[in-house]
Amino acid sequence: MRDDPVSFGLPEDETGDILAMVNLGDIMEVFTENSTFKMVSPDTLDPDRKHQETPWIYTKTSHFGASNELVANTILLANEFLEQLFSIDSPKRLVIIQKVRDIRNVLLEYLCSLISFTEKLKEEIDKYDFNKNEMNGRAHAYFPQIKNIDGIATELLITAKRCIQEISVLVNCFITLKAKHGRIDKLLSEIESEHDNANELIEVLRNNLAMCEYIFSLRNSQEHAATTDKPLIVKNFNIENGLDLSLPKWGIKNDALNFIHIQANEILNFLITFFEEVFLACIILTLPNFPVYKIYFNDAPKKEKPIRYCLNLSIPDTFYERSSQS
């Protein structure tokens, strides 16, 4: 029956322990070290309670679990902080964690595109290395090329830009703003004029503005390539210096070109860190005067759940001494 006690077990082909559960309102996400599951209650499936036999259902939604740094330092980090500051039924907690879930999903989309690209890159390099000693006249028997490389660049840059926009909108979940801003410079301008007490958030946005604008410029130069004097240049495998194999690169015309796989990975790391910094700066704005909380950097995160920051109650020494003596 739907109202009977329920226990959640992993499918037979899954191993490991449940390391975290995140309440997202209509669903619950369950995390093992290497997987994420979505669990849906009977009340979500049958809100009018017309069918007493409606079951709980769960499905595997991702092969990335709590041990993935992206997962750990987005939704799991946010959940641990929010659980300490808000009740489980708090509407504000729900709005924030759902937005963080959206950001996590965009980042996972980016990560999957990057993994797919790097796997294709390795496959082409391996084929080239295997065949490079075989020549047909002066031509290589096999020369590597990434199919649809412009489409891959589009996937990466659209997703990176969308992630920045989602992080920008996350701020609206914490403080009142006149609009939802898709650009960090616009967000920063309003916060500086309307929320000058948000010192940490202002500093975070200022420090990350240049990189956000650079990512936007890469995407915009590609999107408007036909109408701009500085389009995005995307180069496939090439031969440089007469005989050196050059890996795929991208860059804005007349600027230096960068290896796609290296810069795309740098962008991913930036986006995760940018989320962390914006989220923590917003959390600071919501901390009560009492009890006193402090945010700590975890310099030895656990392998199975490598969350980099934690929120702890700051207990005065006098209180601790008095408690230990009683």
Each language-model region and where it sits:
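Acidic, Ser/Thr/Gly/Pro-rich intrinsically disordered interaction regions
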Residues: 1-112, 134-151, 169-326
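Extended, well-ordered alpha-helical segments in internal regulatory regions
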Residues: 157-175
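Eukaryotic low-complexity, intrinsically disordered regulatory regions enriched for acidic, serine-
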Residues: 152-156
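Extended alpha-helical scaffold segments
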Residues: 114, 118-128
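Hydrophobic faces of stable alpha-helices that mediate helix-helix packing
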Residues: 111, 118, 160-164
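Short E/K-rich amphipathic alpha-helical oligomerization segments
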Residues: 126-136
